[in-house]
């Protein structure tokens, strides 16, 4: 199976990629570096705690790096010409986790091969930080992870995996991203295993959640 991952550089993305690669060899990773400038503060008050916790949780005393067997490219924007040249290969699956919105051109290039890791319950919360918006709305039963096909709308594609988080009394807010990432690993591995067996399960999103940013 020929697998491409489109992502950004961070501890939880690195851990995700390495875990997938252990069972299904990843051919290439393209990291996107662009960021959207805002005229207001976007850093969360617990971001530093989150980063520190994830480095310990995922890597402890080992080096935080992508496995040496994976080809890695770093570009500004996954939708630019350089990226499109890199991804013209015949990939069987393109996994999107953490980069910007994918252009309609790339969606059409890969048709039904693009899957998205959405750290939230997409049927209820679309867009960025869906898990935090669920908390804001006191909607604790709709915190989890969704794996879905990518279509030309945002987080509305057919669902391949959806699972809610199990919370422990000792959990902190900065543990949340690691929990949704662990579910992402479970969901993507389940999808790839089903794909290997020719037993693909998907369901349409009947409820289309509100978009948050």
Predicted regions and their residues:
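One-carbon transfer enzymes
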Residues: 1-213
């Amino acid at each position: 199976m020929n697998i491409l991952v489109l992502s950004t550089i961070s501890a939880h993305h690195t851990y995700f990629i390495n875990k997938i690669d252990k069972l299904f060899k990843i051919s290439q990773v393209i990291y996107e570096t662009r960021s959207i400038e805002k005229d207001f503060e976007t850093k969360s008050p617990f971001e530093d705690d989150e980063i520190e916790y994830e480095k310990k949780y995922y890597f402890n005393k080992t080096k935080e790096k992508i496995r040496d067997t994976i080809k890695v490219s770093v570009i500004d924007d996954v939708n630019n010409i350089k990226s499109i040249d890199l991804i013209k290969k015949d990939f069987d699956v393109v996994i999107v986790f953490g980069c910007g919105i994918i252009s309609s051109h790339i969606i059409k290039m890969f048709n039904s091969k693009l899957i998205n890791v959405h750290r939230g319950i997409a049927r209820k919360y679309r867009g960025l930080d869906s898990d935090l918006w669920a908390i804001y709305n006191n909607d604790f039963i709709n915190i989890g992870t969704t794996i879905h096909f990518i279509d030309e709308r945002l987080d509305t594609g057919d669902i391949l995996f959806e699972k809610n988080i199990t919370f422990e009394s000792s959990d902190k807010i900065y543990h949340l991203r690691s929990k949704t990432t662990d579910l992402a690993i479970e969901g993507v591995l389940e999808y790839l295993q089903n794909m290997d067996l020719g037993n693909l399960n998907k369901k349409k999103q009947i409820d289309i959640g509100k978009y948050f940013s």
